[in-house]
């Protein structure tokens, strides 16, 4: 539970930066480095033409192209767990706050978001540092275009 409190504190600070007009509050450069260290084993970022922009063509996790402010669990041809699909169907999108909390405790975040103690996330990796997660979100926000309708589209 303390991870949620820490994540909430960091994202509260981040939210004030976003409210001031910033798309995200982290360092894009630091996020790129952390993505290379922590995410590439499972994820890629490939554009709509299939060009890999980041990652090693991993197939364990979904493509993270256009992640920022997109619906959870909606990348075509990826087999998500039921809980993350359900979260997306309730209108959840990848905001900085949601991303930071999720990557620190995927199952815990889904259980809280869905108010369902049986919900489980498929992502086994947990990011330890909230600032790393904020930076990675900032980096991912630069890769891809926002969906035409907020809250819809690919994850």
Model-predicted regions and their roles:
Residues 2-10:
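Sec-dependent signal peptide recognition
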Residues 16-36, 44-54, 60, 151-155:
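Electrostatic cytochrome c docking/interface patches
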Residues 33-45, 62-66, 100-104, 121-124, ...:
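C-type cytochrome heme c attachment motif
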Residues 50-76:
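N-terminal, post-signal-peptide region of Sec/Tat-exported proteins
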Residues 50-55, 76-95, 104-132:
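Axial heme c-ligation environment in periplasmic c-type cytochrome domains
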């Amino acid at each position: 539970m303390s991870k949620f409190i820490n994540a909430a504190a960091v994202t509260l600070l981040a939210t004030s930066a976003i409210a001031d007009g910033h798309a995200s509050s982290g360092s894009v450069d630091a996020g790129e480095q952390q993505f290379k260290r922590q995410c590439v084993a499972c994820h890629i970022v490939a554009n709509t033409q299939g060009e890999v922009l980041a990652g090693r063509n991993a197939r364990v996790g979904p493509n993270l192209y256009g992640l920022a402010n997109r619906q959870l669990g909606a990348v075509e041809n990826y087999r998500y767990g039921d809980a993350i699909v359900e979260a997306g169907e309730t209108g959840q999108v990848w905001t900085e706050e949601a991303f930071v909390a999720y990557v620190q405790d995927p199952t815990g975040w889904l259980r809280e978001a869905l108010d369902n103690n049986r919900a489980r996330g498929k992502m086994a990796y947990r990011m330890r540092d909230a600032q790393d997660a904020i930076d990675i979100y900032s980096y991912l926000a630069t890769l891809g275009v926002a969906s035409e309708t907020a809250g819809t589209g690919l994850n």
